[in-house]
């Protein structure tokens, strides 16, 4: 069956089974010659024949060197035994003790090495019988050597009956020795996917992100992936209805899961910089569910992340929102019914400031050009919409005589923005560009949902609020390139004080595992309250992603995306004990 899967079956699928895929009279002379049985673990392909022409892959050793020899070297004589398989020879030198020898033969070129009391002896020679050559002793002296055969290797002779029995034998029985399988097939993969549990947390400090705030010595219950009760009284009413696993949270803190608004984990090669607009590409087509960073970020309390296209062009690709369901396939990682997003970008990256002298061709090359890319794209999208609108109004007979407009996946995505069906998250730094894009959006009839990074957001907070944009920034990143020199660690707190929905993001696989510490910096530098700072990585990114009705706080009916902390979640000394 395995052989047919490689030969006759694909030949049949390709419609060429009358000439290929089997060894029969009249078929094309395509076959391979092997050293051992076809599926032997140590088999080698010796020749590959294509249309009757042989191509040598691994030349077969012409001479069998196995046997008994005498080694003459430096005035001494030693017995030498060469054994093993023809393609994998072993040798032994016999003196007072038996010494293992490395013996390699490639046709008539011989290489020998062994260890004596002084170190390594290396010999190189040629021939069949005798073998002659030069070598270097362990003391560094060069000498000649001679190897003379005493007795050849006695091959096992098989009878005609034995050969016929082998040829006429039935199919080989393949044992299922693959062992246990898990997914992902990497470290920390599951043998069986974990089931949703009924869990009751008691005596724990709750960070609710609701009007109740932080509640000490409280309780919370979850069932079938949902929060079913919050608070001691509510839990008391239902504690006997289900078989809960009870977790004593004394001294511990329970919060909603961390949400990373800007991530690039579980992706690879998703910076389509070949053109100024690549809105047709989708991160959901490139997700790698076996990325170990999913597991690591779960260990840091992250439960949801928005996977973004890179920032190589003004209009990038479509985003993907995932839940960190380690061990699931791509479809199960994707967040159900999430509002679709697309990545935009401004600044040095899109005008190719640091791309080198050979990247001076693609438009735009200036910040002025970036603005025109946006206008050009959305004007084309509106014209595209008019063409399709006119086409849809035609009768069936008119459509037969006419020509249907060309389908454009790039413009389809931009149309979704104009119709309010898709949101934008935009890579941004400088106030002038942030202001420019808001003006473009206002004039074209759409809104920028999120300015991400936005390190000069504190300069344009009033205009952002008037436009209706949110902010997903870094806590204290600064001076890693020229356009971020005006960044300040107070930015997040100032934006929050202005009434703008503000979040902290990672943009980095390692940073995401410590987003709780990033949130703490809003308290340290900006004077934000602990509860507001905690919302920067939980409720506020949920609002920016339009999923706050399902997650981001501890409320009855919301998803049980939870993190149990060993201590205060904003402390650098606290660790994640459990993530749900």
Language model regions located:
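C-terminal cap of metal-dependent C-N hydrolases
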Residues: 28-61, 204, 555-580
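Active-site core of metal-dependent hydrolases
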Residues: 1, 12-14, 35-36, 40-51, ...
């Amino acid at each position: 069956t395995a052989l047919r899967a490689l030969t006759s079956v694909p030949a049949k699928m390709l419609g060429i089974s009358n000439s290929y895929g089997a060894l029969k009279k009249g078929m094309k002379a395509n076959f391979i010659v092997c050293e051992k049985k076809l599926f032997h673990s140590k088999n080698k392909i010796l020749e590959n024949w294509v249309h009757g022409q042989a191509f040598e892959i691994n030349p077969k050793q012409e001479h069998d060197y196995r046997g008994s020899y005498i080694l003459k070297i430096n005035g001494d004589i030693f017995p030498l035994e060469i054994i093993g398989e023809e393609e994998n020879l072993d040798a032994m030198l016999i003196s007072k003790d038996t010494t293992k020898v490395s013996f390699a033969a490639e046709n008539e070129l011989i290489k020998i090495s062994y260890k004596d009391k002084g170190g390594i002896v290396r010999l190189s020679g040629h021939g069949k019988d005798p073998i002659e050559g030069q070598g270097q002793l362990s003391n560094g002296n060069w000498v000649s050597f001679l190897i003379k055969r005493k007795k050849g290797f006695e091959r096992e002779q098989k009878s005609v009956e034995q050969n016929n029995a082998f040829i006429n034998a039935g199919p080989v029985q393949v044992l299922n020795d693959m062992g246990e399988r898990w997914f992902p097939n990497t470290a920390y993969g599951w043998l069986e996917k974990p089931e949703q549990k009924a869990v009751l947390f008691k005596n724990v400090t709750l960070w609710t992100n609701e009007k109740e705030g932080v509640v000490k010595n409280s309780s919370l219950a979850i069932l079938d992936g949902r929060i079913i009760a919050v608070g001691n009284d509510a839990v008391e009413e239902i504690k006997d209805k289900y078989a809960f696993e009870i977790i004593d949270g004394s001294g511990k803190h329970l919060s909603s899961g961390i949400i990373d608004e800007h991530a690039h984990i579980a992706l690879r090669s998703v910076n389509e910089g070949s053109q100024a607009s690549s809105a047709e590409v989708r991160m959901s087509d490139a997700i790698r569910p076996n990325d170990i960073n999913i597991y690591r970020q779960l260990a840091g309390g992250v439960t949801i992340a928005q996977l973004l296209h890179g920032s190589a062009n003004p209009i990038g690709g479509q985003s993907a929102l995932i839940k960190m369901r380690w061990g699931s396939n791509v479809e199960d990682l994707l967040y159900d019914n999430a509002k679709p997003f697309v990545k935009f970008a401004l600044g040095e990256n899109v005008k190719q400031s640091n791309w080198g002298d050979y990247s001076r061709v693609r438009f735009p090359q200036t910040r002025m050009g970036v603005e025109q890319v946006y206008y050009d794209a959305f004007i084309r999208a509106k014209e595209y919409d008019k063409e399709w609108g006119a086409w849809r109004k035609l009768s069936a007979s008119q459509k037969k005589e006419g020509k249907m407009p060309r389908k454009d996946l790039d413009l389809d995505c931009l149309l979704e923005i104009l119709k309010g069906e898709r949101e934008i998250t935009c890579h941004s730094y400088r106030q002038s560009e942030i202001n420019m894009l808001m003006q473009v959006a206002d004039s074209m009839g759409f809104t920028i949902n999120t300015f991400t990074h936005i390190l000069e957001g504190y300069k344009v907070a009033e205009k952002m609020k008037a436009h209706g944009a949110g902010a997903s920034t870094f806590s204290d990143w600064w001076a890693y390139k020229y356009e971020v020199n005006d960044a300040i660690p107070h930015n997040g707190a100032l934006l929050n004080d202005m009434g703008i929905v503000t979040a902290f993001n990672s943009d980095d696989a390692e940073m995401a595992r410590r987003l709780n510490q990033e949130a703490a910096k809003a308290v340290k530098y900006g004077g934000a309250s602990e509860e507001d700072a905690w919302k920067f990585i939980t409720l506020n990114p949920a609002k920016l992603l339009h999923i706050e009705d399902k997650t981001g706080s501890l409320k009855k009916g919301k998803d049980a995306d939870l993190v149990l902390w060993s201590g205060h979640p904003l402390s650098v000394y606290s660790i994640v004990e459990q993530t749900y």
